[in-house]
């Protein structure tokens, strides 16, 4: 028997980045994948085809760093609470092998010895800033001392005799010999925070990079200084990350001066300078050199594949969301199905549902959370945002234009579109009717707080769900909206509602974990009630077949229900593990799209036996 549901595609979130803080992109010893973190997730992506992704979500707290063991069989990931998890990479389930708490506080970096047997972990613990121990028992194999402030970076020489280096906010790097690892001496060449330390793959050298714009090269075995790259300053801004070439001859650096550079370390000269732009979001916070791939990470969260032959234009740029996705819709355009998603930073992204190729709209868009979106019959994406505007964006152009943003009197939180150029917008304490991108009618003094709205596909009827647990029906009459004086009762405060595509049913979900379906032709009598969610249901979407609909909740679960029989249902547990499901949409009768506060978009194949 086929599984009733199967994950088809995962369009992963971007790395979570912060201005002025370096971000680690972990490499894969086998060369296939790369790793980074966003929120509680570790994202594993295929380096040749980044649309192939896997998301690990077993940390209870925000994860900061994740790195493969040199064997390639395990990944170690560390979070803000000081938990280090070591987990299997060979199985889809990613079974936990070991969990340690080397110190209480944020883990900022970690490093393995080449035999995958020892791990060094550094960060901002309360009683110590680092630890080094055996991977299978947690027994200490030395001490990380010598710093009096948070340690940002650690690395271990991948050839014997082992050496270990650290970089700290005390403006110093430190050098250790071992095992057991013992502090040998401090390197105080830098004048600002040391952000990154890395040994070359052959172990002959290690490099340190700092907020002072300098990179120093040292002997990997003795720790003696060899040179400063560029003679003095390597970059005009702070340097956040460095990564060696596989043959140890060159070094990639990423800087707040909005450039990345390749250095010939032996000749002490710049081979290439990659100018990434002029916007503050073009600051470079991370980098990775793996096989022939050179990756750098911008403050925008975008991942750039650098082109040595054309330094001013990346080969490709991976885009997407780095903040939680709040809403979603889908639309067919020229035979292709596109997914549109909006996040809580105002960013709207569109995705080719087949390939995962994606981009944002050009121009200046929403400046705050996008709360709801829909596509109208004119092929415009209609969106409302906490910036108090409703926007109409032409989907064939995909660029924001100033004249198509309509200012609301109060903050909008939900909208629905209908035939005839109508949009109904719910603002706080107000319902606004718009026609052809203009406000034409408003109802204030509602006596209840409107939360969700749907327009009947035949036009004319509007259903508004309130926090008081009622659904009220209205009629569009020309340029006004009239109450029908008809109220339907949900089982709790209404969170979302939707008409089936044929207009026969209205499904209403509520904060009391229930979905109620009303039959429209029969005067909105209650047709069926659907129980199953363990927490507030927040979103609902009808399949094009009008016989099934999906609901998503704060319990991380998605259900696909059969209208005629509440017992015939498909349950997708942990659709987005540890994160609320925030949006649902159907590409076709058997393909469901889900989005979540984990900033990822997933496609599921649904089959009915």
Swiss-Prot record:
| UniProt WD repeat ranges | 6-47, 50-89, 95-137, 140-178, 182-220, 226-265, 272-308, 313-353, 360-410, 434-476, 482-520, 525-563, 568-606
Give the main location.
cytoplasm
Bilayer-spanning residue ranges: none
Q: Which keywords does the record carry?
A: Actin-binding, Cytoplasm, Cytoskeleton, Repeat, WD repeat
Q: Supply the Pfam families for this chain.
A: WD40
Top-level taxon of the source organism: Eukaryota
Q: Which Gene3D superfamilies match?
A: YVTN repeat-like/Quinoprotein amine dehydrogenase
MF terms from GO for this chain are: actin filament binding
**GO cellular component annotations, sorted alphabetically?**
cortical actin cytoskeleton
Q: Where in the cell is it found?
A: Cytoplasm, Cytoskeleton
What GO biological process terms does the UniProt entry carry, in alphabetical order?
actin filament depolymerization; locomotion; sarcomere organization
What's this protein's function? Induces disassembly of actin filaments in conjunction with ADF/cofilin family proteins. Enhances cofilin-mediated actin severing.
Family recorded in the similarity comment: Belongs to the WD repeat AIP1 family.
What protein does this entry describe?
WD repeat-containing protein 1
Q: Which organism is it from?
A: Gallus gallus (Chicken)
